[in-house]
Amino acid sequence: MTWALRRLVLAPAVVASAVLLWFTLPLWLLGAALVSPVVPGRLRVVRLAWVAVLYLTIEALLLVVLLGMWLASGFGRRIRTPYWEGIHYDLVQGVMWIFFREARRVLRLTITTDGPAPDAHPGVPIVVCCRHAGPGDSFTLVHALMHWYGREPRVVLKDTLAWDPAIDVLLNRIPARFITPGRPGEDVDKQIAALATGLDENDAFVIFPEGGNFTPQRRTRAIERLRRLGLQAMADRAERMTHVLAPKPGGLLAALDAAPEADVVLVAHTGLDHLTGVADIWRALPMDKRLTMRWWQVPRAEIPTDRDARIDWLYGWWETIDAWVAENRPEDLPPGRSR
């Protein structure tokens, strides 16, 4: 029923909304231009309006293109072959390139990377563990992996993202998993292991061990959860980390077991992580910010084989990430200040 609602109701509604938007676009732009002078921030409303137009337009075009691919692949019979999988990855990369080009141009967002060069992992599959904080960090990571590192990411996502029609259709045609943490009878670690199986030399398995975007409230709940489980030592270590959530090791351990040839790449980022709500994002627009990503490569030979040792190793790296974030804090904009 949920699948039918997303595919047969929501997806056509998005396409129809995009068509209606373009027919009425002059009115929307005129309204945005009239409101913009009384709203703090240079052309803030106009910029946001353009981002909304761009998003809805690309969403609708993607759905049309994906329908065409389904027809061209024999009504979906060949849609999961390597040929069509490669075309879908090219489509993802193209869409990410457009979005981030517009983010640079319209929102004045720049992205810098620090760490191993793109050719630091030649011919080796990688498992990528990333800090989860700030708006759109998963898309930024996918863009970086595809655009700069030439990788085809396999991503684990929360099932709520499947309500975006284009994401729903597209990621169900390439190696990815929508998971529902806590759902009875759903073995998340088993799904993660299945997705991480069979990585080749240009694949990157992507996982966010924290399980959710960082907020102070989630950090407190994660520490309390460890204490309820009797994991006092882990809770104490998590309490000393102030910029990250306590990592949940199960998914990463399952991925490491399923991909015994893979190196591990850990990723921290800062710049937008302090934007934890709609009000924060609104105050920061137009962004005029620099998002910095720090990458570390860990060769497989340096990763412990024992489960408890791996958990300790993961916590040690999360402490490194926490320290890096503390040293690279973004400068918050005062509320109401224009940029």
Residue ranges of each PLM-predicted region?
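General small-molecule cofactor/ligand-binding pocket signal
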Residues: 112-114, 177, 296
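Membrane-proximal helical "anchor" segments flanking the first transmembrane region
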Residues: 1-127
